[in-house]
Swiss-Prot record:
It comes from Oryza sativa subsp. japonica. It is a single-pass membrane protein. One of its GO terms (molecular function) is actin filament binding. Residues 191-215, 738-749 have a biased composition (Basic and acidic residues). The keyword Membrane applies. This is Formin-like protein 11. InterPro entries: FH2_Formin, FH2_Formin_sf, Formin-like_plant. It is found in: Membrane.
Length: 929
């Protein structure tokens, strides 16, 4: 651990020194490059430069007519002065004299030609030495100097008179261009003027300073190169020391960092050989398998993967390109079995100790060792690729070789040195010996994130690729059988380990016939057409929603169009659901016309269109279906209407003839008149029956007993006395028994009367049972039902007498429809008469209780009575429960007092109606008579 830390510190110090020293060396090199001596301006060079300037001038799109003006006003003295400063030599001015050469060139034209020269690509000639390449910094310095000198000249010319001197030809000169494109280095004139030094105003002083400055260029270059070389050598020595230290330290670790072998991928590997590595879960290794258009396979592994065995199966016969692992991936064992042809293997930097074993059939293998920039010195030429020697034939895959210890990947890759010899490490356990060819290796598992399927497993020796494909294609595809697979556990014995492979054999042909997708039954043409419709484009005639709903309903009912056609022609009974479905989703007139005109194949239509196309050939098919539906539904509908009429008739009779209901109405009327004494509501002779629903709203002084409770208790008492008298009459034969005589008997108590009266009043709901049924009915609905039956009968009769008569058809449907119309006319006529009769009966019943109401209330009377009966049953239950819970009172000492309290139980609750108690006996007597 300390050694690794020391290496990292040494590497960090080396990198810091290189970062500090390389800029100084580079600066010296740049100074030396900028001080390259330009050639002397000879007449030949001036002419060549003039031609190049003219060519550049035209190429830049400038006006050629102004070229002569530029030649007259542009002085070559500027170029000569710059060349003297740059080279430190005394260059003679051999250019001819031109009058007016000292004139000042305009600012726009001067900037235009300088910008143009800085953007051109042309070769410069340097005397007899031929072509010579100048650096971009040299051209930048030359053009910047031209801009500065011209700016100073223009400012000096305006202030100082023109001096006498030998003019120079006005041809435009160019700096020595390079053989590759240079960036535009011309800067704006204002920036050039600001950056010009003040020493340039004095030419003699400036020349001396430039010579002193240029004289130190070469020493700076030598110093920079020396420092860079020393740093580079130190870096190389440090890398060699690190490689040697890593190799020596790894001798003590015989276990490889990572090993991917075919044995690791099998689930039956033993624990002694290491746990199998799941490649999908490795965070370090990520192999990408990408298949191109031609089936090329690229396997890419990330940095840091070592000892990787890449096995190419036999089926990879197309050209494959193996993308190598990046730097740091060492000890790559690539085994190419037979059939792996045209393999291009590229090894980048850091991939050392590559052991490639090519068995028979591995032909045309191109191994390209690509070294990145910086790994070799500039003087080292690229070596041509070396073809590998022929590989002997192998009967079985070779044993994996000893893995090399991994090398640490440094951030700055050093030049590729010759690797030291690999140390001898303990090899992994050898594979089991086999006399014959071993089993095929399993293919590498599919990597996560890869959508491509992995290649099939390799074949056995001697087998052909086409044999597997033919065998797979020959097998018929069967229906899937969904189950949950269980992974075999090699650590323990399972029941599946005891199953023998040859103990059970099944009939392959029978399985294909039973569970195959492709049906071999050719007798049913309709099923074959329906099964093949998915492969073709179906023709849609109906509305999509209508077609879908009709197809779903027909599939659920399971009726064929031929059965429908036969039933319609013979007049047989069809399911009502089927007829309603066909009528509901019947096609429109336009859709029906298109179905009739369709003359193509039926299998080209959808399921709904096929069904309708078959049955639509029958004339008036939907009118026939409507008639069949009416024939099927009429008996049931007529029976329901007749039963409703009977219920109403019985309910009216029960309500008019119920004695107990009449007694209840009498009690309510007398109680209401007594409570309304002295008001305009008193003295009533009758009341509407909906008043019965208001009895529970009036409560007594105790806050619990309502007026309905009071009325029920009174009726319970009176009905109890009456029941007792009726029982005695039957036993003794006496025609009349007074109530006072009953009260004199001490054995008769109040509880006995309550029990008898409570049974009588509780039976009122059972007595008016048909009234409750009549309350459920709807008079308007009954009227509409009868009217609908009559309308359907008229429509069917019209269809029979007009449409069917025009066809002159003598079929079973025609005969049955004629008989049905004749019979149904009598039934529907009877229903129409009964409906009128029932309406009159209900109206008479309502008038019997309410008088001449004036408006038709329908069956509301029965609804009111039904609700009142529900309230009455509830009160009777409360009274019955109260009688059980209440304590039994002790009998009074005087029989007269007990009789008096029995005779007047209502005085305590409602004293105002005490005088009415005297009439109770007479009322009971009247009822008895």
């Amino acid at each position: 651990m300390m050694r690794h830390c020391r290496r990292e510190w040494l590497l960090a110090l080396c990198l810091i020194s290189v970062q500090l020293l390389i800029p100084t060396g580079c600066e010296g090199v740049l100074v030396a490059a900028s001080n390259m001596s330009p050639p002397a301006l000879t007449p030949l060079l001036i002419n060549q430069v003039d031609q190049l300037v003219e060519h550049a001038w035209v190429k830049c799109g400038l006006d050629k007519r102004t070229l002569e003006d530029v030649r007259r006003h542009f002085n070559y003295n500027h170029v000569l002065a710059i060349l003297r400063r740059m080279s430190g030599q005394d260059i003679k001015d051999t250019s001819p004299d031109i009058d007016g050469g000292t004139s000042v060139l305009s600012l726009e034209r001067r900037d235009a030609i300088l910008n143009c020269l800085s953007k051109q690509n042309f070769m410069s000639i340097a005397g007899q030495d031929g072509l010579k390449i100048l650096s971009a910094d040299y051209i930048k310095a030359l053009i910047a100097s031209l801009r500065t000198d011209l700016a100073q000249e223009s400012s000096t010319t305006k202030s100082i008179p023109e001096q006498a001197g030998k003019p120079v030809p006005g041809k435009t000169s160019t700096p020595k261009p390079v053989n590759k494109p240079t960036d535009s280095v011309s800067s704006p004139p204002d920036r050039s003027y600001k950056s010009a030094p003040t020493e340039k105003e004095n030419p003699p002083t400036k020349s001396v300073a430039e010579k002193k400055k240029d004289s130190s260029g070469m020493p700076n270059a030598f110093i920079g190169l020396s420092i860079a070389g020393i740093a580079l050598m130190a870096h190389l020595c440090l890398c060699c020391f690190m490689c040697h230290g890593t190799s020596s330290s790894d001798l003590r670790d015989d276990k490889p960092l990572l090993t991917l072998n075919p044995s690791n991928l099998s689930a039956a590997s033993k624990s002694s050989q290491g746990n199998p590595i799941d490649v999908n879960k490795l965070g370090v290794v990520s192999l990408k398998s990408e298949a191109g258009q031609n089936g090329d396979v690229k396997l890419i592994s990330k940095e840091g993967t070592n000892n990787v065995n890449v096995v190419h199966p036999v089926s990879s016969v197309s050209e494959s390109t193996l993308m190598p692992p990046p730097e740091g991936a060492n000890n790559v064992n690539m085994v190419h079995p037979e059939g792996a042809n045209n393999m291009n293997v590229v090894h980048p930097e850091g991939a050392n100790n590559v052991n490639m074993v090519h068995p028979e059939g591995a032909n045309n293998v191109n191994v390209n060792m690509v070294h990145p920039v910086g790994s070799l010195s500039e003087s080292t030429p690229m070596q041509p690729p070396v073809m590998p020697p022929p590989i002997p034939k192998l009967l079985s895959p070779p044993a994996p070789q000893a893995p090399m210890p991994p090398l640490k990947a440094s951030p700055v890759p050093p030049p590729e040195p010759s690797p030291p010899p690999a140390p001898k490490a303990a090899p992994p356990p050898p594979p089991p010996k086999s006399t014959g060819p071993g089993p095929p290796r399993p293919p590498p598992p599919a990597m996560p994130g890869s959508s491509k399927t992995r290649p099939p497993p390799p074949l056995k020796p001697g087998a052909k690729v086409g044999a597997v494909e033919n065998s797979n294609e020959a097998k018929t595809k069967l229906k899937p059988f969904f189950w949950d697979k269980v992974t075999a556990n090699p650590a323990r014995s399972m029941v599946w380990d005891h199953l023998k492979s040859g103990s059970f054999q099944f009939n392959e042909q029978l399985m294909e016939n039973l569970f195959g997708y492709n049906s071999t039954d050719k007798s049913s043409d309709t099923k074959k057409d329906l099964s093949s419709k998915d492969a073709t484009q179906l023709i849609r005639i109906l509305d999509p929603k209508k077609a879908q709903n009709l197809a779903i309903s027909l599939r659920a009912l399971g009726v064929s169009p031929q059965e429908v056609c036969s039933a319609v022609k013979e007049g047989s009974e069809l399911p009502s659901d089927l007829i309603q479905t066909l009528i509901r989703w019947s096609p429109s007139n336009d859709e029906e016309l298109r179905l009739r005109l369709y003359s193509g194949e039926l299998f080209q239509l959808g399921p709904a269109e096929q069904f309708l196309r078959v049955i639509i050939d029958i004339p008036y098919i939907f009118q026939r279906l409507d008639a069949l539906l009416f024939m099927a539904n009429l008996p049931e509908e007529a029976s329901n209407v007749k039963q409703s009429f009977a219920t109403l008739e019985v309910a009216c009779q029960e309500l008019r003839n119920s004695r107990l209901f009449m007694k209840l109405l009498e009690a309510v009327l007398k109680t209401g008149n007594r409570m309304n004494v002295g008001t305009f509501r008193g003295g009533a002779q009758a009341f509407r029956l909906d008043t019965l629903l208001k009895l529970s709203d009036v409560k007594g002084t105790d806050g619990k007993t309502t007026l309905l409770h009071f009325v029920v208790q009174e009726i319970i008492r009176s009905e109890g006395v009456r029941a007792e008298r009726a029982a005695k009459e039957q036993n003794s034969g006496v025609s009349s028994v007074k109530t006072d005589d009953l009260g004199d008997k001490s054995e008769q108590t109040e509880d006995g009367y309550k029990q008898l009266g409570l049974k009588v009043i509780s039976s009122l709901g059972d007595e008016l049972q048909d009234v409750r049924k009549a309350a459920i009915l709807d008079a308007d609905q009954l009227t509409m039902s009868v009217a609908s039956l009559g309308h359907k009968l008229m429509k069917t009769n019209e269809f029979l007498n007009m449409d069917m008569k025009s066809l002159d058809e003598d079929s079973g449907f025609h005969r049955k429809l004629t008989h049905f119309v004749q019979q149904s006319q009598t039934d529907i006529t009877f229903l129409l008469e009964e409906e009128k009769k029932m309406r009159l009966l209900v109206k008479d019943t309502v008038d019997y209780f309410h008088g001449s109401a004036g408006k038709d209330e329908g069956l509301r009377l029965f609804v009111i009575v039904r609700d009142f009966l529900a309230m009455l049953d509830k009160v009777c239950k409360e009274v019955k429960e109260a009688s059980k819970v209440a304590p039994v009172k002790a009998k009074a000492k005087q029989p007269s007092q007990s009789l008096q309290s029995f005779r007047d139980p209502r005085v305590n609750l409602f004293p105002a109606i005490q005088h009415l108690r005297a009439d109770s006996s007479s009322s009971s007597s009247d009822d008895e008579s």
